[in-house]
Amino acid sequence: FNDDREFDGFWGIWDEPFLQYMKSVLDKKSTPFLSTIFTVTSHEPYVIPEKYDGQFDKGFIPMHQCVGYTDYSLKKFFEKCKEEPWFENTIFVFTADHGNQTHFPFYEETVNRFANPIMLYKPNRAFKGVDNRLASHMDIYPTIADLIGYDQPFRSWGKSLISDDQQSP
């Protein structure tokens, strides 16, 4: 990505243009592929592009508006990705790199203060709802292995989030 006009002035590139750029990068990959995308708008100082001022709810905490913008950016990303042949056979894993401000007392408790969301999306599989069981970033690897049907032994400290079977470390 080489367009300084899209620099947010703090961390990197605004989410929407960056995700559109990354979609074009994914289009050039041979399958199967693994790719990691890290967006930055939901980090301090919690600002969004000026052209979107007033379009996203400011909510209860400064980060809410940024999350609205990131959500919009992901929607635009997926609208484009759905047109590609690789989309239906792709597993998308969303997670955060750290916890942050909260409006809910549940997350003020010590054990929940470091909570991060993990979301799985696989277009050709029905994942619906919310699972509030304790999970960790360590669980992503065995979950992906489970989703792709990997049936060989492997070492992991985590466990699959879609299976009730326990994987020994």
Positions of PLM-derived features:
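Solvent-exposed soluble domains appended to multi-pass membrane proteins
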Residues: F1-P169
